[in-house]
């Protein structure tokens, strides 16, 4: 069920250039699942559209959730100025979330993340660790300065970092590592740039438990306006799915990635 609540800012800090980590507190946290997102109103009357931001970490005991976002425009720049005690008008938790029920203790999971797509995978890794799943995370970034969440992710998974320019970790893309893995994962969870998702979608198209977290521009965020639709493979003229309502998580081989 989608709720509307004014969440309280507990803390905020810049963790990489233009990338901020914000902790929010409220009753809504009790309903959150890995892979879902919040649709947040910008506290500025001139900004009409809410911003969808993925949930990175969920602490239901403390009623706190962490979001991580990158400044992309005026709206997110305003978010970055908020202080502890400020309120944010949030709709959520929204989206279907990752399916973690398909994997059990003793099995292996592969987590593939790129850039600002890494945050929603942190809660995935945490929940898999709690289940006793052996998780292996491959995280790709542009350069050393852009690397985020390596230390936190390492608490729950074996982590390999790649950078495009080789300034940190292994030089290359996540595909450089994934193509050379010596094990077959029982489940795969991915989030990142379109190019990375296309790679994962193609490589694991026939895998029974491989999932992609997608991003599309949203307007209403409630499934009514169809501004965030994606096309189903093989049914391009017949069926659209809404990222806000039917996603943002889809199985590999299910949708057309533009």
Curated annotation (Swiss-Prot):
The keyword Cell membrane does not apply. FAD binds at residues 51-54, 68-70, 75-76. SUPFAM superfamilies: Ferredoxin reductase-like, C-terminal NADP-linked domain (SSF52343), Riboflavin synthase domain-like (SSF63380). One of its GO terms (biological process) is 'de novo' UMP biosynthetic process. Gene3D superfamilies: Dihydroorotate dehydrogenase, electron transfer subunit, Nucleotide-binding domain of ferredoxin-NADP reductase (FNR) module, Translation factors. It holds the Pfam family FAD_binding_6. Residues 2-100 form the FAD-binding FR-type domain. Pathway: Pyrimidine metabolism; UMP biosynthesis via de novo pathway; orotate from (S)-dihydroorotate (NAD(+) route): step 1/1. [2Fe-2S] cluster binds at residues 220, 225, 228, 244. Keywords: 2Fe-2S, Electron transport, FAD, Flavoprotein, Iron, Iron-sulfur, Metal-binding, Pyrimidine biosynthesis, Transport. Its cofactor is [2Fe-2S] cluster; FAD. Binds 1 [2Fe-2S] cluster per subunit. One of its GO terms (molecular function) is flavin adenine dinucleotide binding. CDD domains: DHOD_e_trans (cd06218). The keyword Electron transport applies. HAMAP family: DHODB_Fe_S_bind. Responsible for channeling the electrons from the oxidation of dihydroorotate from the FMN redox center in the PyrD type B subunit to the ultimate electron acceptor NAD(+). Heterotetramer of 2 PyrK and 2 PyrD type B subunits. Belongs to the PyrK family. This is Dihydroorotate dehydrogenase B (NAD(+)), electron transfer subunit.
């Amino acid at each position: 069920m989608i709720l509307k609540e004014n969440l309280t800012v507990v803390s905020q800090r810049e963790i990489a250039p233009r990338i901020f980590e914000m902790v929010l507190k409220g009753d809504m946290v009790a309903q959150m699942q890995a892979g879902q997102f919040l649709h947040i109103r910008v506290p500025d009357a001139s900004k009409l559209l809410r911003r969808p931001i993925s949930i990175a970490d969920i602490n239901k005991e403390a009623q706190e959730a962490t979001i991580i976002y990158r400044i992309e425009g005026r709206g997110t720049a305003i978010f970055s100025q908020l202080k502890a005690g400020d309120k944010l008008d949030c709709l959520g938790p929204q989206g279907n979330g990752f399916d973690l029920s398909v994997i059990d203790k003793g099995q292996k999971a592969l987590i593939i993340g790129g850039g600002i797509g890494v945050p929603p995978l942190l809660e995935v890794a945490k929940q898999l660790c709690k289940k006793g799943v052996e998780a292996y995370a491959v995280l790709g970034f542009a350069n050393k300065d852009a690397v985020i969440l390596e230390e936190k992710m390492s608490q729950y998974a074996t982590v390999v970092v790649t950078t495009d320019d080789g300034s940190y970790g292994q030089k290359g893309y996540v595909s450089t590592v994934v193509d050379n893995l010596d094990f077959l994962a029982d489940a795969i969870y991915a989030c990142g740039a379109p190019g990375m998702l296309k790679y994962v979608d193609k490589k694991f198209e026939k895998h029974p438990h491989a999932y992609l977290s997608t991003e599309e521009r949203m307007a209403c965020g409630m499934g009514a306006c169809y501004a965030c639709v994606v096309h189903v493979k093989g049914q391009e003229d017949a069926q659209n799915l809404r990222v806000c309502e039917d996603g943002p998580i889809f199985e590999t081989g299910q949708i057309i990635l533009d």
